[in-house]
């Protein structure tokens, strides 16, 4: 099923707006904080992740999605496994197929790997090596963010996603060419590959091939297209990090539009805390309790709330702190 979206005005200056963070720059901590405050989104270069490693995983991913649907559905499941079109259980659909896996190698259960591939060992190794490398990059980014915020110790954020019980996941998405996405023959409308949403975790890390489609939502409500760059990684601030910074960082709303000519393949690492981790504004970032914008909740509570919502819902709204003024209204 194709989901249509009304055409939107894309600012001409949009391409130059996206912050680019050079991880080799010792002062990048300040640029990271500003990017999280202004956009909740940034591009990372000089990240240290092997290009060969990424290429191998992309090759294996393309091989998997090239299999007959009857074979891919043998590893279908919920929440982990193969899925096609249907996103979640609340009516959201898109022009996408995906493979969702547990990304925590230390949990004991390990990622869900398809056993039907021609070379499952190669795919398994690529997934493990990629996840390990991206996790390390994510820790580095979070620790630089902590430095930029002046928080001690510097592993305040990174330790939440490095715990052996972390609830992190890896998602491989494939957006096939969509003939309906040709706006000249489709009334000027876009076809939605993956509907607009925010990521609930602390932070997410995206890498794609060179096919466009990703868009982020600006504060004025407009959407800007993100030029693809297969050599770089893109980071999204998640809902949990928005809460921990008491709204100083913004969880970016984003979506993917289908392409009429080329396939888009993306890999997203979602860095989540353990299920029992309590999420609340960091006390070092607020002067007093009255400034808190959100109630405390566990990651498990928030995760469950996302399972009961639509993609486009403002899922943080129910956790916003009820002030005396709110109660009087």
Curated annotation (Swiss-Prot):
Gene Ontology molecular function: gibberellin 2-beta-dioxygenase activity; metal ion binding
Reactions that this protein is recorded to catalyse: gibberellin A1 + 2-oxoglutarate + O2 = gibberellin A8 + succinate + CO2
Positions bound to Fe cation: 197, 199, 254
Metabolic or biological pathway, per its Swiss-Prot or TrEMBL entry: Plant hormone biosynthesis; gibberellin biosynthesis
Top-level enzyme category: oxidoreductase
PROSITE patterns from the UniProt entry: FE2OG_OXY (PS51471)
Fe2OG dioxygenase domain sequence ranges: 165-273
Domain of life of the source: Eukaryota
The EC number(s) this enzyme carries: 1.14.11.13
Cofactor info, note text: Binds 1 Fe(2+) ion per subunit.
Keyword Metal-binding: yes
Pfam families recorded: 2OG-FeII_Oxy, DIOX_N
Family the UniProt entry places it in: Belongs to the iron/ascorbate-dependent oxidoreductase family. GA2OX subfamily.
The protein, known as: Gibberellin 2-beta-dioxygenase 1
Organism lineage string: Eukaryota, Viridiplantae, Streptophyta, Embryophyta, Tracheophyta
């Amino acid at each position: 099923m194709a989901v249509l979206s009304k055409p939107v005005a894309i600012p001409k200056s949009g391409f130059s707006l996206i912050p680019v963070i050079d991880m080799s720059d010792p002062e990048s901590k300040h640029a990271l904080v500003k990017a999280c405050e202004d956009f909740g989104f940034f591009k990372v270069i000089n990240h240290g992740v092997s290009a060969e490693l990424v290429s191998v995983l992309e090759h294996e991913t393309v091989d998997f999605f090239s299999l007959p649907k009857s074979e891919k559905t043998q590893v279908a499941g919920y929440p982990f496994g193969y899925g096609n079109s249907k996103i979640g259980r609340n009516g959201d659909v898109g022009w996408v197929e995906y493979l969702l896996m547990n990304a925590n190698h230390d949990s004991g259960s390990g990622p869900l790997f398809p056993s039907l591939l021609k070379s499952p060992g190669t795919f398994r190794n690529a997934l493990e090596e990629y996840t390990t490398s991206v996790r390390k990059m994510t820790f580095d980014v979070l620790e630089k963010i902590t430095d930029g915020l002046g928080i001690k110790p510097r592993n305040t954020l990174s330790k939440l996603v490095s715990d052996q019980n972390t609830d992190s996941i890896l998602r491989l998405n494939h957006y096939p060419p969509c003939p309906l996405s040709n706006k000249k023959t489709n009334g000027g409308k876009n076809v939605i590959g993956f509907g607009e949403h925010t990521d609930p975790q602390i932070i997410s890390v995206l890498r794609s091939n060179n096919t466009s489609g990703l868009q982020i939502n600006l504060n004025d409500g407009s959407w800007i297209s993100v030029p693809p760059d297969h050599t770089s990684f893109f980071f999204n601030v998640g809902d949990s990090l928005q809460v921990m910074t008491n709204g100083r960082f913004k969880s970016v709303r984003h979506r993917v539009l289908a392409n009429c000519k080329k396939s888009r393949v993306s890999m997203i690492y979602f860095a989540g805390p353990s299920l029992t981790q309590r999420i609340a504004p960091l006390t070092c970032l607020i002067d007093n309790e009255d400034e808190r914008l959100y109630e405390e909740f566990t990651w498990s509570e928030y995760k469950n709330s996302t399972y009961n919502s639509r993609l486009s819902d403002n899922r943080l709204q129910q956790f916003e702190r009820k002030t005396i003024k709110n109660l009087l209204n």
